[in-house]
Amino acid sequence: MESDPMFIGFGYDRHPLVEGRRLVLAGVEIDAPLGSLGHSDGDVLSHAIIDALLGAGCLGDIGTWFPETKEYKDANSLDLLKETVKILEERGFSVVNVDATVVASIVKLSPYREKIVENLKSALETSRVNVKFKSGNTLGFEGEERGISAYAVCLVEEKGCTKST
């Protein structure tokens, strides 16, 4: 039995934390004293996953598809993630799974995990989603509460690909 080809993607994003901005992860607003500075809503988790998915499909990166233009100013990154899934599907790919890690010490993120994962499962059209949170242990700009970062890895499957023998 032959299986469809599978491809791995890796994504990473980081943003400074500043006053006057919201902190959003996978469309979930986090109650925090500082928010993520970015052209869109600054959702580092969605951005890292977008880059992982585009990487798996050899389709460039988030800036290729969603440049820093007026069209994407303050954009909802969960919507951009849904659009990325459509871009992959149009090219014959489907998301198998995503595993991500968010690094931040500004606020405890684990109480938000269930809603974050729920949003990602819906956006990615897969039940195979895992999100982990790390504090940075007082190291780096995440540990010093000056920033937030996210790492993501994904597996996508190319559907209906025929192999010649």
Curated annotation (Swiss-Prot):
Signal peptide: none
Free-text cofactor note: Binds 1 divalent metal cation per subunit.
PROSITE patterns, sorted: ISPF
Designated name of the protein: 2-C-methyl-D-erythritol 2,4-cyclodiphosphate synthase
Site entry: Transition state stabilizer: 39, 135
Family matches, as CDD domains: MECDP_synthase (cd00554)
Taxonomic classification: Bacteria, Thermotogati, Thermotogota, Thermotogae, Thermotogales
Cofactor: a divalent metal cation
Gene of this entry: ispF
